[in-house]
Amino acid sequence: MAAAKRIADEPAFVLHSYDWSESSLILEVFCRHQGRVALVAKGAKKPSSNFRPVLLPLQPLWLSYALAADGNADIHTLKGAEWVGGHVMPTGDALLSGLYLNELLLRLLARSDPHAALFDAYTGVVRVLASEHGDALEPVLRSFELLLLRAIGLLPSLAAQTMTLAPLQADTRYTLVPEGGLRAAAAAERAALPGHQWQVLQHALDDAASHQATVRACAPVCAELKPQLRTLLQYHCGSPMLRTRQLMIDLQAL
């Protein structure tokens, strides 16, 4: 019998884990070269398992795994996991924000669809979440939301009105909506940006260093951008509401 094909030393993050048996876990991981992958971590729940202290969310890992013998199977077998190190686990709002991004990736990324640039952006966001992030948190979150939507083909061009392809006027306010894309905002719509700011965002997304450029472009417009992206993302994620979003609402109500 031919040996199972193996993926070795793959940069990855754990997005989510759940019980598979009394001693094992199913992992949903985001890999740089393989995309979103499901793995069974046999024995990972045992106190003696080398996997147990390593398979945590928001921690950079090197993973090795054997592909399922059935080439069409979705779940592969974890063979090795090594913590890369470099930062501590985020806490507080930063931890919730990281889990929110993980949930977006779980809902929106198809299995085995690689997005290396998006993985690199995610790595940068996690680094910020684990640091004394201060005012940097909101811009990196908004930037990643834009990059994610663009990577999976759900973000229209921000340089023109979506339905008419008419160019944006610098001082006219426009809003981003789920079914109509970018359109002129009504007077009562508060979540909108002037045309020149949408164009700045588009230029940033087109930049070779799109993550850093988009973070800078998002910084002055986070308050206006946040509700528009939240609505767009929830629309594409479908029902029910994102669990992390509901948790944030519940905590704010306390």
From Swiss-Prot:
A single GO cellular-component term on record: bacterial nucleoid
InterPro entries reported for this sequence: ARFGAP/RecO, DNA_rep/recomb_RecO_N, NA-bd_OB-fold, RecO, RecO_C
Annotated GO biological process: DNA recombination; double-strand break repair
Upper classification of the organism: Bacteria, Pseudomonadati, Pseudomonadota, Betaproteobacteria, Burkholderiales
Gene: recO
Functional description taken from the UniProt entry: Involved in DNA repair and RecF pathway recombination.
Record-linked PANTHER family: DNA REPAIR PROTEIN RECO
Superkingdom field: Bacteria
Protein name per Swiss-Prot or TrEMBL: DNA repair protein RecO
SUPFAM superfamilies: ArfGap/RecO-like zinc finger, Nucleic acid-binding proteins
Transmembrane segments: none
